[in-house]
Amino acid sequence: MGYTAAVAGASGYVGGELLRLLLAHPDIEIGALTAGGNAGTRLGEHHPHLTPLADRILTETTPETLAGHDIVFLALPHGHSAALAAQLDADTLIVDCGADFRLADAAAWQKFYGSEHAGTWPYGLPELPGARAALAQTRRIAVPGCYPTCGTLALMPAFAEQLVEPEVVVVAASGTSGAGKAAKPHLIASEVMGSVSVYGVGGAHRHNPEFVQNLSAVAETPVRVSFTPVLVPMPRGILATCSAPLKPAIGLDEVRAAYQRHYDAEPFVHLLPEGQWPTTAMTLGANTAAVQVTVDEAAGRLVAVAAIDNLTKGTAGGAIQSANLALGLPETTGLPMTGVAP
């Protein structure tokens, strides 16, 4: 049985990546393509690489346009999904690539996003404990943020097996596409090229409470997270370097064994051989995460590094992976496992 899918926010980076992946999906037919200010224009004006869809006209994002599809992917700015989703049929599979339904803590949502909390949907990171079962029974999916996807995959086995103390430092470098497609002075080429900068320092980034939520759930105890994002001059990709204090008598053998237990059967998470470290180039265009872990014996700390493509595994690919599970399809359906090189 085939399914039809609408993409709301099709002119943006996430919308474009969804369409690139959906074009290769054997069980999903692309339906309505909608946009905000770009409604009425050709898709090819915004995504010239999507040749098969180049002449499709973007329509306004309304409940009427999205109705009648089996799946609706929402690639909208934060805070715009909840009202629209409330007007769609309960049987429609809605996959929200924004932040509206990620956080369970209403106070955390209000603190970091400044609006009324819309609620919580099943969280679309299948690799988390219990996530696949929850996704298989839902018609509403909240796609994780790109930074929490990367950092959570770097750290999850260590917290799941109680190898580290409940505190962690995450420093994650990301390309500029993570900030979206809208023009911003600090993202123009003359500002970004040749420069590396931090932002959202001191726990101010909106993904901070998502890290806390994920890792605390895995560890089954509150985890303190110090997260610093770094903007680097490349279009896409995230490299997260994470460090946490090891519990007594934990060494590298125990750590690697834990990561192997958790990731050997995961189709999209690759634990690299000892001595090989993740790079963003490894995952470019693929729905994969490259992970490596070691022990800093002098500091008594675990060091875990992960790389993903922020638009693929970090958003659009993760959205389709979760949708596959909700539809009863193999979760790898239509998703690339190999990156693009050089």
From Swiss-Prot:
Keyword Amino-acid biosynthesis tagged: yes
Keyword Disulfide bond (UniProt): no
One cellular-component annotation, GO: cytoplasm
Keyword terms: Amino-acid biosynthesis, Arginine biosynthesis, Cytoplasm, NADP, Oxidoreductase
SMART domains: Semialdhyde_dh
Subcellular localization: Cytoplasm
GO biological process, one term: L-arginine biosynthetic process
Spans through the membrane: none
Involved pathway(s): Amino-acid biosynthesis; L-arginine biosynthesis; N(2)-acetyl-L-ornithine from L-glutamate: step 3/4
EC number annotated for this UniProt entry: 1.2.1.38
Chemical reaction(s) catalysed: N-acetyl-L-glutamate 5-semialdehyde + phosphate + NADP(+) = N-acetyl-L-glutamyl 5-phosphate + NADPH + H(+)
UniProt cross-references to Pfam families, sorted A to Z: Semialdhyde_dh (PF01118), Semialdhyde_dhC_1 (PF22698)
Active site: 146
GO molecular function: N-acetyl-gamma-glutamyl-phosphate reductase activity; NAD binding; NADP+ binding
Function description: Catalyzes the NADPH-dependent reduction of N-acetyl-5-glutamyl phosphate to yield N-acetyl-L-glutamate 5-semialdehyde.
Family statement: Belongs to the NAGSA dehydrogenase family. Type 1 subfamily.
Entry protein name: N-acetyl-gamma-glutamyl-phosphate reductase
Encoding gene, per UniProt annotation: argC
